[in-house]
């Protein structure tokens, strides 16, 4: 375990004198450099970021903090954070404005997808490889085809998901609809599909990726986290309901 920890907690690079290390040094537990590692540790215990998968990013003023790619998420430390200037170009990658890069770590493959959420006003974006998210994408495809949405109604927990910017939260009787996009061989190639899904569903705060996972965002880290929790609970419930032959969306059966 010590060797694995060292793999993640490597020394920072020094392309300039201090590599802007002051950006990730804070005693405040809510500072993004401290909060992202704490969130990733929780997500690991929930099975959301197993095997280095998934990621988390927080926008803090005109800075974006991003966990590195290809590392064990439960071992991430504040010094492992990448920091970008915001706004910043999504493409080409060489034009992205990194103002802090830890040595020997790779920028997240999720970066352009996180930027897509931030361009729409999000304060935090979470990407998980939840098994429940993957399963509901497969069930929707089998029952409704590749154009189908995940839809569920008359379940108390949908009240934890916003209806859209400034529109309040879903009510118990509402139908929650989450769009699903197709997976791609490389994470960054999901960006176009994510953008299309958001443009077609401007009120959504989440997009499922078939056979892959989900992207969830919120106005703040706390809102993104609780929305992701609510959705994952609903996905697990939906899988169990399907086993029992119970409909997800009662509004469709009326």
From Swiss-Prot:
Annotated active site: 156 (proton donor/acceptor)
Alphabetical UniProt keywords: Amino-acid biosynthesis, Cytoplasm, Lyase, Metal-binding, Methionine biosynthesis, Zinc
Protein residues bound to Zn(2+): 127, 129, 212
Domain of life: Eukaryota
Gene3D superfamilies: Class II aldolase/adducin N-terminal domain
Any one GO BP annotation for this protein: L-methionine salvage from methylthioadenosine
E.C. number: 4.2.1.109
Any one GO CC term of the record: cytoplasm
Cofactor binding remark: Binds 1 zinc ion per subunit.
GO molecular function annotations of the record: methylthioribulose 1-phosphate dehydratase activity; zinc ion binding
Catalysis performed (reactions): 5-(methylsulfanyl)-D-ribulose 1-phosphate = 5-methylsulfanyl-2,3-dioxopentyl phosphate + H2O
Subcellular location: Cytoplasm
Metabolic or biological pathway, per its Swiss-Prot or TrEMBL entry: Amino-acid biosynthesis; L-methionine biosynthesis via salvage pathway; L-methionine from S-methyl-5-thio-alpha-D-ribose 1-phosphate: step 2/6
Keyword Amino-acid biosynthesis set for record: yes
Record has Cytoplasm as a keyword: yes
Group of enzyme by EC: lyase
Cofactor field: Zn(2+)
Binding positions (substrate): 110
Sequence similarity: Belongs to the aldolase class II family. MtnB subfamily.
Functional summary from the UniProt entry: Catalyzes the dehydration of methylthioribulose-1-phosphate (MTRu-1-P) into 2,3-diketo-5-methylthiopentyl-1-phosphate (DK-MTP-1-P).
Protein name: Methylthioribulose-1-phosphate dehydratase
Organism field: Talaromyces marneffei (strain ATCC 18224 / CBS 334.59 / QM 7333) (Penicillium marneffei)
């Amino acid at each position: 375990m010590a060797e694995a920890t060292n793999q993640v907690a490597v020394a920072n690079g020094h392309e300039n004198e201090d590599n802007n290390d002051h950006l990730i040094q804070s005693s405040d537990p809510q500072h993004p450099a401290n909060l992202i590692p704490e969130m990733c540790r929780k997500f690991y215990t929930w099975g959301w970021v197993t095997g280095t998968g998934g990621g988390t990013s927080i926008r803090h003023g005109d800075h974006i903090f991003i966990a590195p790619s290809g590392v064990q998420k439960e071992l991430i430390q504040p010094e492992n954070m990448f920091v970008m200037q915001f706004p910043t170009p999504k493409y080409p990658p060489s034009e992205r404005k990194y103002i802090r890069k830890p040595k020997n770590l790779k920028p997240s493959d999720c970066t352009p997808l996180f930027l897509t959420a931030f361009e729409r006003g999000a304060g935090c974006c979470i990407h998980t490889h939840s098994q429940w998210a993957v399963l509901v994408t497969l069930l929707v495809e089998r029952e409704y085809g590749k154009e189908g949405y995940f839809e569920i109604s008359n379940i108390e927990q949908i009240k934890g998901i916003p209806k859209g910017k400034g529109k309040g939260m879903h009510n118990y009787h509402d139908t929650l609809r989450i769009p699903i996009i197709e997976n791609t061989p490389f994470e960054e190639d999901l960006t176009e599909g994510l953008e299309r899904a958001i443009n077609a569903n401007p009120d959504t705060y989440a997009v499922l990726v078939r056979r892959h996972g989900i992207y969830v965002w919120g106005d703040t880290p706390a809102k993104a986290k609780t929305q992701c929790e609510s959705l994952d609970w609903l996905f697990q419930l939906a899988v169990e309901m399907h086993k029992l032959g119970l409909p997800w969306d009662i509004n469709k059966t009326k």
